[in-house]
Amino acid sequence: MKTPQLPPLIIKKSPSAFYVYTYKNKWDPEKKRSYRASFKKVGTVTSGEKEGRIRWDDHFLAERPELRDFICERKGKDYVFTPMNEGGFTLSQAMEVKQLHAGATWALDQLVVQSPIGEALKTAFPQRRDYLKVLSIAYFIILNQDNNISKYPTFAEATRLPWGAPLHPSSIGRIFREIKKQQIEKYFSALQEGLIEQKREVGDDDKLTLALDSTSISSYANKLPNVERGRNKDEDNLPQINLLMLVESKSGLPIFYRTYDGNVPDVQTVRRVIADNSRLGIQNVVLVSDRGYSGTKNINDCLRNKVGFLLNMKCGISGSLTQELIDEERLNLQDLNRRDWYTQVFQVTKKINWIYEPSPVKNQKSTKKTQESEELYWHIYFDRQIAENARQGLFERIDRVREKLANGKALDENEQTLLEEVFEKHEQDDAVSYSIDNKKVDQKLRYKGYRVLVSDEISDAGKAWCAYQERWIVEDTFKTLKSRLGCSRNRVSDNESLTGKTFVQFLATSIAMIVRTRLRKYSEECKKNTALPMVYDGDCRVLDSLNNVMQTKFCGGYYFGEIAGKRRKLFEALGFRLNEGS
């Protein structure tokens, strides 16, 4: 078979791919030399690099039909042709049989399709099927338990992935840099809409309960704009960025995140999150947060933006409304009739008419005409066991301080603070002695064991307590991100890459949380002795086992290896019923 002859060709790079162009030489009489002109695109290098297989455009194939019988690859500066057989493959391709690890990625594919993630990705990244590339990198992070992208080519060579073509680290870096804030926000909106639609389909019209919390991600790159030194929650002596997430409590699915400079305190981040949710049209939600995010400003911001909330208020602020309400209800919270049998804590609910400014204007004083009011539910709880544990703990710390003072030993920093807080110093002549101030001890213990949750949505104290307890899901999400997926460090050198990589790590965490939620639900529902026993944190071992289900790939198609015994039960634990012939 005669090898086709090609016209003069040149490779040109665009932001997304390498394209093949024909051209004609023209003579420049002034410079007395030829130059290239009349460029026309005729194909694309499918590898994403300068070298690789070329996919010819239809108009070029119509002009040169003989090219249909060959596979053309660019190697160096040469174009190498290989004849194809009747099936459209070369002889070497027809004889090639490849085995890939496929069970885990097949399961992840099904989870993505069944969740709102799949459609949200297509909505946010429609061009060039980029969502498949992003998804493949996320699978790598999940299964490799590492965010070191240099290991991706080796992993992809042996693993069935949504994007089957090679992705070199430089290509992945380009993908990270191309992920923009607008695409991420489009993903958030589509994800939230999909989640609400799924809830409606099963008759659940309740608002989304979103657990809110933040963590710190350390970085070795000191020159990134957002990397600052702050209160590192992992106690690393490294600069960091702060990452705040919203996680849907029932499904365990993270639906929103935002990064902040490492030196921004938690309480200042919520106002921006509330504004973001309002701007993106994320509605019908109730934010559930810990004490780090409570405060009058955040309550007012939630009310202004029509965002539901359940905030855990700080009980230690002297003279606050929280302490005032506790003092008012202290006797009621000793009444056994106020003790809830399910939560096993004493509880009281007070309705407070909360006055706020719906549209504050800078430097303009608020008046009755401009103010509005909202009825808020202040749920006050008392747990005797927590109060007693705090009392005993304080007594033990006081005893250690007294023992060290008696023996002339030095106090550490915490002990010195306690000495100043609850001891009275006595100086007589040259002698110094200390005695315990019982009033100060009582004051230190006065608000121990109490919790105050405030909400504009949840009027029942028991439901509010349960909704708050479910916020552990966001802590589990951070554990998954940082420990399970190995993303406690950002290995990037520029801010554009940081934006994209953070999103892909968020996506990987979202998919991993679906796996964890499915396994946890399966474990809770299993009552038969024959059920597969599940352990907490078992998702890693489950995916490792499924990853050994192989796919044999050949020129005409593929088939999976036999799935039996334990692996069949693992698929069932994730919600997939396989045919007996599988």
Predicted regions and their residues:
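Dynamic "connector" segments at or just before major functional cores
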Residues: 1-221, 244-256, 263, 271, ...
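Secondary-structure transition/capping motifs at alpha-helix termini
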Residues: 29, 159-165, 182, 202-203, ...
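An anionic, glycine-rich sequence signature occurring as long contiguous blocks
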Residues: 239, 259, 308-467, 537-582
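Active-site beta-loop-alpha junctions of metal-dependent nucleic acid enzymes
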Residues: 258-280
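Acidic, metal-coordinating catalytic cores used for nucleic-acid/nucleotide bond scission
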Residues: 288-297, 315-318, 496-499
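Short amphipathic alpha-helical "interface-anchor" segments enriched in bulky aromatics
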Residues: 464-491
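Basic, amphipathic alpha-helical segments enriched in Lys/Arg and hydrophobic/aromatic residues
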Residues: 494-515
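Short, glycine/acidic-rich hinge or "gate" loops at secondary-structure transitions
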Residues: 519-533
